[in-house]
């Protein structure tokens, strides 16, 4: 009689032990912290004037180091896989935008095929954040298809805040600065401007606001530029194109998804500007803000010290870019 009773007690003991173990495993699982999602930032470079094929890998390295982000840089390449910013009908690797948490874009007058353009427009319509530079006000140029003409002007204006209008002129590109940059009144406490100090930019001033033109949507200027050498001044056209214009702003864009995206845009972007820590700081602070990480921007701005020298070629068209280079993963 005692033997079956012992078996019964042993069975109960085993069941209790298993139940306790199961509860312990459950508790451990519930108390484990959720894995932090690493943001995927895709840098889209497709312009032939301002050497973004050099500045974007540099910014991507900073984003990887400071944010711990996964970074992808995509380029215009030729048929042999070499980086060729003069090729306007192809950017290799845009499918990376399908998994992107942020698109950082520097494009100029591209005539991409529909499949490639759709990667960009689908991303924009998703409501995910965007950071844009300079010539992205005229990212596309479609001359021979009236159904695509909206991408030449209306599309960048509604997404980024403005389309291509004019600038104050080229003067010995890269030999000396031509624009003084300062904080827009009332924006001193904006997190994107942490660590900011006034500087002189090599980027000649773009006209985006004033005269017959106005920044679109809820654009809020953060930085102002003052042109120190202006073709419009020489030509007596300052009533239309003021010497003072916004050079950086924030806005929102609500696409077909119904989700409101954060957009940071700057008309800065000359390759020599990125030699200045303050310009790299504006770019990186803007990236943090776009991702909703503004509370993690240090008081003096994001650390933008470089692990290697940044020695870009000067701005300019034609064959001024560095040759025989292929895309490579950001280390």
Feature roles, as predicted:
Residues 18-20:
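C-terminal motif of bacterial Sec signal peptides marking the signal peptidase cleavage site
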Residues 105, 110-195:
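A glycine-rich, often tryptophan-bearing local segment used as a flexible ligand/cofactor-contacting loop or short
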Residues 28-34, 40-44, 48-139:
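Helical hinge/lid and interdomain linker segments adjacent to catalytic or ligand-binding clefts
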Residues 1-4:
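Short, Lys/Arg-enriched N-terminal segments with co-localized hydrophobic residues
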Residues 6-12:
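Sec-dependent signal peptide recognition
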Residues 27-29, 33-39, 55, 65-69, ...:
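Extracellular ligand-binding/catalytic regions of CAZymes and related secreted enzymes
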Residues 60, 121, 193, 284-288:
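Non-transmembrane alpha-helical segments in soluble domains
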Residues 64, 70, 88, 98-99, ...:
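Catalytic beta-strand/loop cores that center a nucleophilic Ser/Cys/Thr
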């Amino acid at each position: 009689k005692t033997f079956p009773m012992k078996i019964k007690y042993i069975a109960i003991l085993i069941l209790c032990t298993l139940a306790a173990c199961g509860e312990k495993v459950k508790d451990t699982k519930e108390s484990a912290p959720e894995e932090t999602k690493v943001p995927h930032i895709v840098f889209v470079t497709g312009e032939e004037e301002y050497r973004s094929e050099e500045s974007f890998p540099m910014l991507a390295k900073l984003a990887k180091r400071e944010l711990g982000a996964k970074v992808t840089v995509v380029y215009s390449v030729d048929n042999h896989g070499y980086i060729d910013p003069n090729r306007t009908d192809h950017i290799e690797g845009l499918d990376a935008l399908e998994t992107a948490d942020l698109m950082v874009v520097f494009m100029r007058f591209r005539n991409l095929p529909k499949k490639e353009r759709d990667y960009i427009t689908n991303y924009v319509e998703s409501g995910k954040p965007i950071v844009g530079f300079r010539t992205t006000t005229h990212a596309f140029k479609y001359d021979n298809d009236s159904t695509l003409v909206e991408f030449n002007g209306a599309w960048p204006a509604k997404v980024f805040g403005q389309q291509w209008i004019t600038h104050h002129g080229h003067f010995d590109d890269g030999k000396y600065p031509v624009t003084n940059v300062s904080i827009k009144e009332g924006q001193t406490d904006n997190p994107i401007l942490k660590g900011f100090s006034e500087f002189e930019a090599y980027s000649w001033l773009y006209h985006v606001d004033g005269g017959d033109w106005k920044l679109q949507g809820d654009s809020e200027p953060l930085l102002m530029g003052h042109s120190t050498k202006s073709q419009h001044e020489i030509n007596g056209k300052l009533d239309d194109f003021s010497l003072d214009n916004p050079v950086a702003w924030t806005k929102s864009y609500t696409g077909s998804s119904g989700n409101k995206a954060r957009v940071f845009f700057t008309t800065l972007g000359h390759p020599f500007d990125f030699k200045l820590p303050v310009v790299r700081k504006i770019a990186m602070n803007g990236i943090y803000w776009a991702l909703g990480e503004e509370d993690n921007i240090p008081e003096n701005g994001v650390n933008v010290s470089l692990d290697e020298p940044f020695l870009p070629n000067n701005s300019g068209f034609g064959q001024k870019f560095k040759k025989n280079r292929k895309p490579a993963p950001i280390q």
